[in-house]
Each structure stands twice: as C-alpha cells, then as structure tokens.
Amino acid sequence: VGRKRHIALVAALGLLATCAAFGQGRRQLSDKQRRQREILRWELFRPVVRGQHAAVSAGTPAVTQVTMRVLQSGGNAVDAGVAALLAGAVTEFSHFGFGGEAPLLIRTPDGRVHSIAGVGTAPALMTLEFFLNREKDPELELEAVQREHKTGHIPSYGTLPALVPGMVDAALLALQRFGTLPFGEVAEPAASLAQQHPIDNMRSRSIAEASSFLRLFPTSLAVYAPDGRRPRPGDLFRQDDLAATIRSMVRAERAALAAGKSREDAIEAVRDYFYRGPIAREIADFVKSDGGLLRYEDFAAFRLEVEQPLRTVFHGYEVYKAGFWTQGAVLLQALNILEGYDLEALGWNTPQYIHHLVESLKLAFADRDAWYADPQFVSVPVELLSKQYASDRRALINPKRASTKFRPGTFGKRRPVHPSRHPLRRPLPDALASKDTTSINIASADGMLFSASPSGAWMPSVIAGRTGIPLTQRGHSFLTIPGHPNVVEPGKRPRITLTPTLVTHRGEPFMALSTPGGDQQEQALLQVLLAALVFNFNAQAAVEAPRFQSKHLVASFDDHAMEPNVLLLDERMPSFVFEDLDALGHQVELRRSRNSGSAPTAVKVLRNGVIEAGADPYAFRYAAGW
C-alpha cells in the first residue's frame, strides 16, 4: 500500500523452492521452507536508492542533500563527507555536536584504507584519583556507587566528562589529506544551517526532554530554548554563536590563502585557529569556571594522525574497522567465529541463525569489556583477531543452549579484568540517559568509500561560552577500575562504541556502513553485513530488516549496566522464533518494530558499478543516489 511493498527476496535467496511431490503428486513446502517463508513475511517501508556516479546515506534529509550537492558540484567523497560532518553537527544536535567525536574510515581510489580516530583525549587533570575521591553532584546524579562516601565514577553530563573535541580535527585531517576542496567551501552549508534551519520533530522533542537539565546551564538554555520556550517542529532554529564560530574558522583559512599558503597549509591554519587560538581559549576558560577539567594546554597538545585500520577476511571479503580504542573489533571477532558455520544452511533469521550470531557476539563482547582500550596506553592482545583464536572460541558455543556467563579469553599469564566483577551500576535521571549517534556513508564511482560514526556532545549538552559549541560527555566511557585497560588516564582515549565500517571484495569496493545505537552498533552492523554479503539483500532491505539485540555485555556508558542473557527481538519476527530461542535458554523480550535504537545506513557497490544506498527509516535516516 502506497510505497510499502512486500519484500522481494524469496526467489533471489532460493529459500522457498518446492520439494518433491508426495503421495498425490502435489508439490508441497517442507516445514523448514514454510518457516522460512514466514520469517521473510515483512514489509519494506522504503525503496532502495541507486546511483551511477555516487550514493550517500546519512542521518537526515538535510545532511544527505548537503552531501549530494558537494558531490554533484565536483567534490570527491571525502569533501562531501566532511561537509556532511559539519552540517550534521549543526542540525543533528540531539545526537551529535561540534564538540563531539567522529571516527572515520576512508578508502582512496588507489585501494588503500585509512582510519582517523576522531575522538579526543582526556585532559591532564582527568585522573583516576580525582574521580575516586570527588563528591557527588546532587543535581546531576541520583545515586552513586560509594567508596568511602565518594562517588567512584565519572558523571555522564556537565563539564567533568568533557574531552578535547575530536570531530573538528578529524574533519580537517580528512579534508587536508584526502579531499580536494578548501575548508570554506565544505563549511558554508553548515554555517548557513547554523544561522537558521527548520527544526524537526526529533530535535524539538529532545529539547523538551532535556529542559530540566538545560536550566542548570544558561549558555545551553539560551541556544536551545531562547526566551524560555522550546522550538516546535517547523520553527526556524538559530545557532548564531555557532555560525559565527564556523565563519571565523573560514576567515582563518582565507587569510592563509591570501598570504600565499597552499590549500593544505590553509587548512592547517584553520586547525591552529581552533586548537591553539581563541576558540580553544574560550572553551577552556568556560570549563575551568564551571569546575571542569579541560584546559587550553590540552587543546594545544592534541593532534590526530592517520592510522592503520584493523582488518579481517570473511569468505573473500576484507572487512575494515577502526582500532581497539573503539568496539569495532567485536564485529571482526564475531565474523571470524561465524566463518566456521554454514550460515546459508542455517537460513536468514532462523532461530539457529540468531542463536549462533548471539553466542558469537557474547564471546566477542566479553573480550571487548576485558581487553579493548587505547593501544597507545595498553598492549591489546594481538591474538584477539587471529583465526586460531576464533576457532578456540567457536568451540565454546553450544548449539543447543545459550550461555549465561561472561567468558573473556586468557592470553598466557595475562588474566582479563572484566567489569562484571566490580560494582559499577548506578541509576540515572531519565533526562540524562545517553542519547545516541548518527551515521554517514558514501560511495563514488572513482572507488572512494567514506564511513563515519559522528556522536558525542548530544542533548542535553553544555554550550561552552559564546562559541556555540556543545561539549562532549565521552569521558564517561572510561572506567574507574584500577588495573582495567580502559581505566581513566590523562591523555588517553576512552574505548568508545563508535564504529564506521568498510568492506571490499578482493580489493574492490563493496560496502560502507555505520549506525547509531551505542552497544548495539556492532550487533546491528553484523546483521546488516551478513544480510547483504551472505544472503544478497539489497542495501535498503539489509538495513530495514528485523534485527535482534543482545544485552549480554557491560554497557559502555551511563550506568555500565549488565543484563546477562537478555535478548531483544523485533516484533516483526514470527512467534516460533521467540519460542525456539526461549527454549534454547535465551531470556527473550519483545521490542517494538522500527524502534530498535540502532538505525543503520549503508551503501553497496554492485558488480556492474551501480551503487545502492539504504537508510533505516527509524530516526529520519535518508539515502540518495546520483
């Protein structure tokens, strides 16, 4: 009805071939085939988008339009991706802001894949001792784990969890190394949107939900609820200070170009203006006056570099993720384990298929929670991504029973420090529950791929003085467990959930995909990738199909909650899937359709060069092709 239509994957997947005639000569479906047909009986809400020159899938229609304009005016995928980052930081402030993070993966036409961290570091004053001994803030914290009457944890909001902003440096480095346009050209759409743009339902609602917190910070209230009134959907929303900040950065570039500097050196001048100039000083002064830890010296010492991504090969497909400072390797570990199973024979989204994916993820998450951290500070076991280690882990999976334990691996004399053995959980006010992420994925005909997971500085955020820049809260992803790899330390990156993904097939571009969803991200992306790679779903079907979510992990932020063996299933799945997984020992819970928390976007390059784009309709994701 309308644009809705039944998913047309049955013939392509070969899942409903009729069996041989029985007694009366009629061709009948086997029980397995009937069950598979019922699993596939769900509706595709949006059509797949296809393009010949380029395709993009991003967080909102406005960001997607900005991206397409840059591509159609001659910019490459990185130019377009940086423009999308900046525009998203303005318009998607419920999920992501200028002071936040943006890990990037980029494939260049020469076939090389590059990683840019896009996450800031802890200030010099952000120490374990500080958080173990500080007093609770009664306005931001309901209750806390007590250690000698102290809180013992990092707060989720305010200025204390603020890191050095990482997104700006990531955008500038990507543009400088892999783009073709000047900063001013890719920043102009963001500056115009900051001057004013129509606010959508999601952003209006996020301001309403955060109103009690915003009143604690006059700088935030002045931006998000001027005159004490939240903007309603369709109102023109202004961020005058942020527009002025962006335009001041553009002026720094123009001055450098006027002085005869190259494009690359002029972008470096923008970087210096932000991290060593008046913007850094104003943010640092504001944070200090509020009792926070971020200082000008932390900005001046910060610099990102292009890094080598992590990688595994799954049935001839090269899958790339960012380093162990993200949770990205969870996907790689799960793929290594699943490579030992015949997933086609199990059948897409059958109970046994879901069971094997969930059990593989449980093992990978146990390793994440015990071992992953900033490799510049800790030695992460290299064996985690080996095929032999995956084989050893696969042997732990019982095909007939769900595991209820956290089982991180052990490496020689090194023993894991798993957070499940420590008291971390604490309640939070609803208004302060973590608010999610956005995503940007681009593919172009020249072989470039761009994948980003922008996040941080989400609502309710603290606006730093007159800069218009919201501060990130990402410091709360550190742990306060002495001896844990992800323990808070000055200059360190927290182990974050943000996880862009690139896939090639024998070196040729295949997919770029990412999603919001915090700890759901790797789970959602695993399901999207396998749907596209193993079962040949198109990009839209892959991101929109019913998904599960395991909560058998340690939450990466907020209350660091643990819900062993809890498995959420999309209500679009047939009842027998719920029943069979319950019989296997999973603690199954129902999740409303199209309300999963994750909302993947993806682009997929076909063998003939046509590029597909898909966007989960949850949370306003939008795709376009050209």
Predicted regions and their residues:
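Active-site rim segments in enzyme catalytic domains, especially the processed small/beta chain
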Residues: 90-94, 103-123, 131-142, 285, ...
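Extended C-terminal regions of large enzymes
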Residues: 321-324, 329, 503-520
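Internal maturation/activation junctions in enzymes
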Residues: 34, 280, 284, 292, ...
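Bacterial N-terminal signal peptides
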Residues: 10-18
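Extended C-terminal subregions enriched in glycine
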Residues: 446, 492, 525, 534-595
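Bacterial N-terminal signal peptides that target proteins for export
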Residues: 1-10
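Short, small/polar residue-rich loop motifs at catalytic or cofactor-binding pockets
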Residues: 306, 434-437, 496-498
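Noncatalytic scaffold domains of N-terminal-nucleophile
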Residues: 24-65, 69, 77-269, 274-326
